[in-house]
Swiss-Prot record, chain A:
Belongs to the aconitase/IPM isomerase family. LeuC type 2 subfamily. Catalyzes the isomerization between 2-isopropylmalate and 3-isopropylmalate, via the formation of 2-isopropylmaleate. Binds 1 [4Fe-4S] cluster per subunit. InterPro entries: Acnase/IPM_dHydase_lsu_aba_1/3, Acoase/IPM_deHydtase_lsu_aba, Aconitase_4Fe-4S_BS, Aconitase_4Fe-4S_dom, HAcnase/IPMdehydase_lsu_prok, Homoacnase/IPMdehydase_lsu, IPM_dehydratase_rel_enz. It catalyses: (2R,3S)-3-isopropylmalate = (2S)-2-isopropylmalate. This is 3-isopropylmalate dehydratase large subunit 1. SUPFAM superfamilies: Aconitase iron-sulfur domain. [4Fe-4S] cluster binds at residues 308, 368, 371. The gene is leuC1. The keyword Flavoprotein does not apply.
Swiss-Prot record, chain B:
One of its GO terms (biological process) is L-leucine biosynthetic process. The lineage of its organism: Bacteria, Thermotogati, Deinococcota, Deinococci, Deinococcales. InterPro entries: Aconitase/3IPM_dehydase_swvl, AconitaseA/IPMdHydase_ssu_swvl, IPMI_Swivel, LeuD, LeuD_type2/HacB/DmdB. It comes from the Bacteria. HAMAP family: LeuD_type2. This is 3-isopropylmalate dehydratase small subunit 2. Heterodimer of LeuC and LeuD. Belongs to the LeuD family. LeuD type 2 subfamily. Its EC number is 4.2.1.33. It is an enzyme of class 4 (lyase).
């Protein structure tokens, strides 16, 4: 099936000065070379609609616009935020989404297929140089493969589906350069949290974060980095392709998708990976980042491993490594929700899920789970949760007096074993059975 | 005169404006019952049609949910004034013809519950008790046009074309963002001189 807008011309439109990755993509998908501050009207390669706004989307398309998707193959509906349905009204909305997909020919990824961003990546519905708009703020995730991914509301999404285009102000870029090598036990999530601390919760508002990581990090790890960029307010989070990482996954990486030498950045920061220790974001803003060691010992009621940030196979492997032969502390509950059916299948086949199940984890249907507080593990007043997700706002996962701490899967797993905030090395004191 | 509700904290997020547990509808009057619930659960009992929210920086950060705009509008809020806004919230405001006014120092101008004089045409907001006044960043002409049309969809439909022609025209007239219409979702960060506000522009009464 054809996806995406027509093929790229192969070279950027006539440029007058060096460009960032964001400027390159918006130039390619628009009609002229554009720079930060310019307005670009651009072709949209893929429009993603999640279940929770599907009704609003359909209403805007049919009642307000009287339009059908201009390119049905460029529109995907994903049932992931509250899947399976939790109430009759949610079930009704999802029923309407299914009917709409059948009627218009747009793609539908139904209950259990997984979280929108993970699914679109697995289906290669985000590719280097593409523009992907999603009705979910974590659509910055597509920047993992150097696609300009951005979140928008229902009205914008409907317009993009109806017209095949959108308008964007070309963002300034913040250049984040990662240097050095991570210590053992430090992960992409720790890097992402540190990056948000350095940038600040609104430190990249309206801007594109351009991450220069060299040939470090897998596709999944790059998704974690790009995913968190919206927590600094960013419009997009673009990880510059490096080495053979993307070609190994079978992507065509256009030669133009790299930043030019001398491109203009609003701000440049450097993060020395070798200096990082496992990090944790404390309530109730994502940039409130500390070393896990500072929070060690805090009693935890629930641990959640999953989401578009950290629900991939490498994340489940990291958790299983800590949990193998051990048990979740009896005063703590552990929820594990794979990010997609593909992740789940892999984790079933290689025994990871069995390891987690034996350790006392509660396994859930691939999807968003309790991340946004609508089902499958919401928190009571006063409860403390360590989560591998991306937001620790007040009320995010249930009651407004619950407390959410964000961390990597390995730290989350260690915390589940100890019943308190812990580092992976702390579980050594708990004997593992064979 | 509208009453001002001051929520001075920075980074008030969409989970506080309209918690996800209430996203089961997009009917504004329904959403309105829960507006600001996790920040101030009594707000919906105090707010009157036409009232103004004054908030700290980065208002509306977090989720892309357009419900954050619908809930406030449904509750009768006519405008939110903050030093700056999270981008998706800001864009959603423009698209819905809802006023999001950028004004540095605004949280110092009012105490909660005071009345305000908002002069959209003049670009000022005044506290009649203290006599102090601040100018807000002019609303982009594009946003005013969208507001006049009743929202982005209506604006596009008025162009009789959802195929994108109107978008293309907008691009051309914007001169790529400098002179002319600052069509971007970030007028506060526009380089160069601010475009003149059309002084004779027909302003709609904001949603009362």
């Amino acid at each position: 099936m054809t996806t995406g807008a027509p093929p790229f011309s192969g070279s950027s439109p006539q440029t007058t000065r060096p460009q960032t990755v964001a400027e390159k993509i918006l130039s390619q998908r628009g009609s002229a070379a554009v720079y930060a501050g310019d307005l670009a009207v651009v072709e949209v390669d893929q429009v993603m609609v999640v279940d929770s706004i599907a009704q609003s989307f359909i209403e805007r398309m049919e009642r307000d616009l009287g339009a059908v998707p201009k390119y049905p193959e460029r529109v995907s509906i994903v049932v992931d935020h509250v899947a399976p349905a939790s109430t009759v009204s949610v079930a009704q909305a999802q029923k309407e989404a299914r009917e709409y997909a059948a009627k218009t020919g747009v793609r539908l990824f139904d209950v259990g297929r997984g979280i929108c961003h993970q699914v679109l990546m697995e289906e290669k519905l985000a590719q280097p140089g593409w523009i992907v708009l999603g009705s979910d703020s974590h659509s910055t995730t597509y920047g993992a493969v150097a696609a300009f991914g951005s979140g928008m509301g229902a009205t914008d999404i409907a317009l993009a589906a109806a017209s095949g285009k959108t308008w964007l102000r070309v963002p300034e870029s913040v250049k984040v350069t990662l240097t050095g090598d991570l210590r053992p036990g430090v992960t992409a999530k720790d890097v992402a949290l540190e990056m948000i601390r350095v940038l600040g919760a609104d430190g990249a508002t309206y801007q594109s974060v351009e991450i220069h990581a060299g040939d470090r990090f897998t596709r999944g790890e790059r998704m974690t980095l790009a995913n968190l960029c919206v927590e600094a307010g960013a419009k997009a989070g673009l990880v510059v392709p490096g080495g053979e990482i993307l070609t190994d996954y079978g992507y065509d990486v256009p030669a133009w998708v790299y930043p030019d030498e001398g491109a203009a950045y609003a701000r440049e920061v450097e993060i020395d990976l070798s200096a990082l220790h496992p990090r944790m974001s404390a309530p109730s803003e994502v940039d409130n980042v500390h070393d896990v060691a500072e929070l060690r010992g805090l009693k935890v009621d629930q641990v959640f491993i999953g989401t578009c940030t950290n629900g991939r196979i490498e994340d489940l492997h990291a958790a299983a490594e800590v949990l193998r032969g051990r048990r979740v502390d009896p005063t703590t509950r552990l929820l594990v929700i794979p990010a997609s059916s593909q992740v789940m299948e892999e984790a079933l086949q290689d025994g990871t899920l069995l390891t987690l199940q034996r350790a006392g984890a509660v396994l859930g249907t691939p999807g968003c789970g309790p991340c946004m507080g609508r089902h499958q593990g919401v928190l009571a007043p006063g409860e403390v949760c360590v989560s591998t997700s991306n937001r620790n706002f007040i009320g995010r996962m249930g009651d407004k007096d619950a407390h959410i701490y964000l961390a990597s899967p390995a730290v989350a797993a260690a915390t589940a074993v100890m019943g308190r905030v812990a580092l992976p090395e702390d579980v050594a004191q708990v004997a593992a059975s064979a | 005169m509208p009453t001002v509700h001051v929520f001075a904290r920075d980074h008030i997020n969409t989970d506080e404006i309209i918690p996800a547990r209430h996203l089961t509808t997009d009917v504004e009057s329904e959403l309105a019952k829960y507006a600001m619930e996790d920040y101030d659960k009594d707000f919906v009992r105090r707010v009157q049609p036409g009232d103004i929210i004054v908030a700290g920086a980065d208002f509306g950060c977090g989720s892309s949910r357009e419900h954050a705009v619908w809930a406030l509008r449904g509750a009768g809020v006519s405008a939110v004034i903050a030093p700056n806004f999270a981008r998706i919230y800001y864009r959603n405001s423009i698209n819905n013809g809802f006023l999001a006014l950028e004004c540095e120092g605004i949280t110092e101008l009012f105490q909660d519950g005071e009345e305000a004089e908002l002069d959209l045409k003049g670009g000022t907001i005044r506290n009649p008790r203290t006599g102090k006044e601040l100018s807000f960043v002019p609303v982009p002409q594009f946003a005013l046009d969208v507001q006049k049309a009743g929202g982005w969809l209506e604006y596009m439909k008025a162009g009789e074309d959802v195929e994108g022609e109107r978008l293309d025209n907008a691009s051309t007239s914007a001169g790529h963002g400098h002179a002319g219409t600052p069509l971007g979702d970030d007028p506060a960060k526009e380089d160069g001189p601010r475009p003149e506000q059309a002084s004779g522009h027909q302003k709609e009464e904001h949603h009362a």
